[in-house]
């Protein structure tokens, strides 16, 4: 049965005992409202590690002034049940006051990796992500940490953080988990109307179009962006916020494509902003 831990002190006590015995720890940091994408990461960790820890913590530092921290869905009982069914050992669910007992004396600032895509639209968001992931890594001390490729910019930033701060953890990127029709699984999908849900499937279809263009030899980003945008505009009635091509994991905007690339989409529906992406090309 999955154990619920609610304090930093108790979590650290358990981790220290596990480390002394040579136990491997797999870690999945989340903000809760779990779905199959999260559970895929939990299953991967359970199959690899002696102990799997899932954090459920809605981090206030990654919410901007126009983003409602209080409205973010919280369902700890359901989340606990879900991860228990797939074999997680511990859910770490600390209070905000325990994670941030006072004003932080040191600000962590992400560099150019946060100046594009989601980071450009949500200033300070990735500073908050890196701060909380640093704290969680120090508390949980995982051997392996699992992040979804759906948030590919976040994955690239966390990998850079691990390198820059010498964290003794290996980051495992997990492929996007999709519905049967291709829509990327997301906690935000529940906010879609019936018509929006039907239209949302075209995000993934437009990425398959981009992949086909690349495989046919197209290397001009503008051509791919224009074709994908045209497809989305003909199939989605909502606002298309972004179609972009960047190198990966460097996140440098590409004009003439060389090497590995990251094609990113963002569409604003009435009550949900959905993102999707595909990473293609040689590393």
From Swiss-Prot:
Keywords: ATP-binding, Cytoplasm, Ligase, Nucleotide-binding, Pantothenate biosynthesis. Beta-alanine binds at residue 62. It is an enzyme of class 6 (ligase). Disulfide bonds: none annotated. Its EC number is 6.3.2.1. It is found in: Cytoplasm. InterPro entries: Pantoate_ligase (IPR003721), Pantoate_ligase_C (IPR042176), Rossmann-like_a/b/a_fold (IPR014729). GO terms for cellular component: cytosol. It holds the Pfam family Pantoate_ligase. The keyword ATP-binding applies. Pathway: Cofactor biosynthesis; (R)-pantothenate biosynthesis; (R)-pantothenate from (R)-pantoate and beta-alanine: step 1/1. ATP binds at residues 31-38, 148-151, 177, 185-188. (R)-pantoate binds at residues 62, 154. The active site is at residue 38. It catalyses: (R)-pantoate + beta-alanine + ATP = (R)-pantothenate + AMP + diphosphate + H(+). GO terms for biological process: pantothenate biosynthetic process. Homodimer. Belongs to the pantothenate synthetase family. The reaction proceeds by a bi uni uni bi ping pong mechanism. Catalyzes the condensation of pantoate with beta-alanine in an ATP-dependent reaction via a pantoyl-adenylate intermediate. This is Pantothenate synthetase. It comes from Staphylococcus aureus (strain NCTC 8325 / PS 47). The gene is panC.
